[in-house]
Amino acid sequence: MAQLCVALVAGEASGDILGSGLMRALKARHPQVRFIGVGGPLMEAEGMQSYFPMERLAVMGLVEVLGRLRELLKRRKALIQTLIAEKPDVFIGIDAPDFTLNIELKLRQAGIKTVHYVSPSVWAWRQKRVLKIREGCDLMLTLLPFEARFYEEQGVPVRFVGHPLADTIPLAADRQAARMALGLDAGPVVALMPGSRGGEVGRLGALFLDAAQRLVELIPGVHFVLPCANGARRAQLEQMLEGRELPLTLLDGQSHQALAACDAVLIASGTATLEAMLYKRPMVVAYRLAPLTYWILKRLVKSPYVSLPNLLAQRELVPELLQDAATSEALAQTLAPLVADGRQQTERFDEIHRTLRRDASNQAADAVLALLKDR
């Protein structure tokens, strides 16, 4: 077989992690493989020749995207032209669907095999995107099983590869070791995780702290840990803590240690709910959006649940308190019993963890190479 050339594009840190794992698995099977495209430091360390820094693609939020739209479109156009000229054996777009799906469509029209790794949330909203995916994508690699079922129904070639987090997080986390590392005592510990973005923490931070204040009355000797995503979030939360007497430890990052150490979690909807589930920690999920945003999303979103544990269980396994239902009293009263006994949740968490633990990088590499076997 001639030297394999694989093009990949990742747009953010999570994609860089996935991309580097996939590259490692491909190299194990094809030591002479050449990688081109756009990746971050982890992908570059695996041998990626990145055409420009991945950070140029990592923009969050509508306003930021609009501010950089001209640059993003220009980079995408240049990337398409370069890749058509290079003619790689396969192109793999990793997440970042608003950037990569268009590239896949153009490359597939030029006769290049295309793979999309990590499904956008088409099963929940903007379902028409599946038409673009079907047209532009030879193979979809999903991290979650219900996503694969959705694509099968829509006639899109798909492979469920499992979730890399399920591979890296142990089936049974050592609570005592995590507590020792964080300097925590033996009593009940609750993790508060109000999100990693400024807007989320602005809407949920004080609410979670109010709920914690109520939990102090309900659970004797309780202690709280709150991992801060970065310095800006820490400053934001320190301001919210002024004037409060709470037995609380702020952590810098260390969200995985906080989850390993705690007995239960009060958590914002998002990827963190998957992490909490993989650590087998009972949780209550809360979320608040700006009223207009919530009103619009309620009409657009087709999914009955917002949290990944419930989407994976296909039933209400964990309580979801959204918008006006998310009061400090309701959060405290719902979480308190779970601190003492959350087995109803955690037994199912263990089953789901085993379903997702499939050695994702190797599964993905095998699927990509199977697509190329006739090249």
Curated annotation (Swiss-Prot):
Q: Catalytic activity, per the record? A: a lipid X + a UDP-2-N,3-O-bis[(3R)-3-hydroxyacyl]-alpha-D-glucosamine = a lipid A disaccharide + UDP + H(+)
| InterPro entries (alphabetical) | Glyco_trans_19 (IPR003835)
Q: Per its UniProt record, what Gene3D superfamilies does this chain match?
A: Glycogen Phosphorylase B
Q: Which domain of life is it from?
A: Bacteria
GO BP terms, alphabetized: lipid A biosynthetic process
Gene Ontology terms, MF aspect: lipid-A-disaccharide synthase activity; phospholipid binding
Top-level EC class: transferase
Q: Which of UniProt's keywords are assigned here?
A: Glycosyltransferase, Lipid A biosynthesis, Lipid biosynthesis, Lipid metabolism, Transferase
One Gene Ontology CC term in the entry: membrane
Give the EC number(s) under which this enzyme is classified: 2.4.1.182
Q: Which Pfam families match?
A: LpxB
The biological pathway it contributes to is: Bacterial outer membrane biogenesis; LPS lipid A biosynthesis
Translocase listed as a keyword: no
The entry's function note states: Condensation of UDP-2,3-diacylglucosamine and 2,3-diacylglucosamine-1-phosphate to form lipid A disaccharide, a precursor of lipid A, a phosphorylated glycolipid that anchors the lipopolysaccharide to the outer membrane of the cell.
Q: Which family does it belong to?
A: Belongs to the LpxB family.
Q: What is this protein called?
A: Lipid-A-disaccharide synthase
